């Protein structure tokens, strides 16, 4: 197939809309549904991300995309009992690719509502069954088992978007886009992110475990496909906070750090002990948890309101309890798509348990940034590579 025609572009008034190749066939096939313009943008960006993660780590990878940025990305590592609980994972053994997607979606379940899923490996029954219970717009993968395809074709009254990508496809060396009738050209960003980029450790502490290296790679690869400016927090092979599309670096660091804090607070014993009413929908449960751990907790705990969500009225999770729980976070990695201009980014990252930093370096205040990292015994690598994405 040489072209596809979505119903419209980014908005319903933007017609006509078309996807095409200058030469040859499109490297993808729509197996079910009718993806829209933004769906395809999410699909192609997310596929590049998971493909790069698989290449860099050798592990199955998955991503959950919304509006051309990842809400989460993860590697296919086993789920702990706590993770199974907070991500609503089914009991029993799960395939690595299913674990990857469950973790990717679990990074920020509110932002993943209505997501586009991407898998580095063939979609299997485990992954399809989990997706079937979630609110999602579509999926891209290099293949599907018969069982998975049957499950996915039954989602959204048969309209769920399923796209298969040719894993051998390599884009042209020059990419083009038009803005306001003017054509822009640039070289395709084929930068290979690997462990060689992590060799320039500029802090006094230079100890990097393999897990820390993998987390740095995950952070950097996620940033490569996130709208800039962006900062990404990672722990144990999954993103836990992505701050995308901000105009200042510190706002990226704060936004992503706040998301990381929320991810960690979802594991607080009080949250794990919440007793929800029977047959509550997953999105309603996600929203209730998000409000419960926020400063607006009365919105779900007020008399006459909590009964709609909980069997038993929960105790308030106090500010002191939240601060004490967040203070226990450790072993977190943060990556930045451009240099940290001031040490304040390191100070904010530390509050969310950051121990490892990967950033390009190159600020006129690098000495201040390094000194701040040294103050907390952090390990910081200067990659020398900027990762802007627009």
Where are these regions (language model features)?
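Gly-rich Lys/Arg/Thr-decorated short loops/hinges at beta-loop-alpha junctions or inter-strand turns
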Residues: 22-34, 107-113, 187-206, 283-305, ...
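Histidine- and/or cysteine-centered catalytic micro-motif in compact active-site loops
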Residues: 68, 122, 236, 244-247
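Conserved helix-loop functional segments at active or binding sites
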Residues: 52, 225, 262-266, 351
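Alpha-helix N-cap/helix-initiation motif
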Residues: 35, 39, 212, 245, ...
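Flexible, glycine/charged-enriched surface loops at secondary-structure junctions
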Residues: 56-64, 162-165, 228-235, 265-276, ...
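C-terminal binding/interaction regions
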Residues: 71, 115, 119-120, 133-163, ...
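Active-site loops and adjacent core secondary-structure elements that bind or stabilize anionic groups
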Residues: 1-197, 212-230
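Glycine- and Gly-Pro-enriched alpha-helical subdomains that act as flexible
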Residues: 71-110, 240-342
